[in-house]
Design a protein with these regions (language model features):
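AlphaC helix of the protein kinase catalytic domain
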Residues: 4-15
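Activation segment signature within eukaryotic-like protein kinase domains
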Residues: 23-24
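Protein kinase catalytic-loop region centered on the HRD/HxD motif
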Residues: 29-39
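C-terminal lobe helix-coil module of Hanks-type protein kinase domains
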Residues: 50, 81-188
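Activation-loop N-terminal segment of eukaryotic-like protein kinases
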Residues: 51-55
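Regulatory activation segment
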Residues: 57, 70-79
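Regulatory extensions appended to serine/threonine kinase catalytic cores
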Residues: 185-201
Length: 201
């Protein structure tokens, strides 16, 4: 028995970063397992994540999941919630495991800050922001968010798919390293994000 992460956040209010870390680590373990079997979820959002009574978290609703090698794009029948879709999903392009990573990054962002990275008056306006905007850094909203955890979140949410984590396992490794040392400064991510900013017009 349990409730969705969406319900949990609504009841709990603002989540502590440590709890957010606990949840996202379990989410990425689930995605890493699915991706290792060639399965992409395509609709990662708090409504599809279950928080069980024992504090464990399960990724649910693989109803629109597809095999990674299937030539699938975003269709009318397979739309993820617009607040969590990746830029490539918004463009209707071919997607892979990195699209799930982007959506998981949005979920982490929402847990850390208590708000979504992009809001708008319509689904189209939100989708456009995923394509062209950079969200506020979590620490600009919540000063207690550790810099290393913020960097993990922002790398997962890179609009450029090639700047994102290459796999759920890679993101999970950084999360596990951070869990061991919350003072860890993931400098290599900072450099990658800086390079991205320098190359953007």
């Amino acid at each position: 028995d349990g409730i969705t992460l969406k319900q949990y956040m609504e009841r709990r209010g603002r989540m502590d970063w440590r709890e957010s870390l606990h949840f996202i680590t379990q989410i990425m373990r689930g995605l890493s397992h699915a991706h290792s079997r060639g399965i992409i979820h395509r609709d990662i959002k708090p409504q599809n994540i279950m928080v069980l009574r024992d504090g464990s978290v399960k990724v649910a609703d693989f109803g629109i999941a597809c095999l990674q090698n299937a030539a699938q794009t975003m269709t009318q029948d397979a739309l993820g919630s617009v607040h969590y879709i990746s830029p490539e999903q918004a463009r209707g392009e071919h997607i892979d495991a990195r699209s799930d990573i982007y959506s998981a990054g949005v979920v982490l962002y929402e847990m850390l800050t208590g708000r979504l990275p992009f809001e708008g008056d319509s689904a189209v306006s939100v989708a456009i922001q995923h394509l062209s905007s950079v969200p506020l850094a979590p620490s600009e909203i919540r000063e207690d968010v550790p810099k290393a955890l913020e960097l993990i979140c922002m790398k997962a949410m890179c609009a450029d798919i090639n700047k994102r984590y290459a796999s759920a396992t890679a993101m999970l490794e950084d999360l596990e390293n951070f869990r061991k040392d919350p003072e860890l400064d993931l400098e290599y991510i900072r450099e990658e994000l800086s390079e991205k900013e320098d190359t953007e017009p």
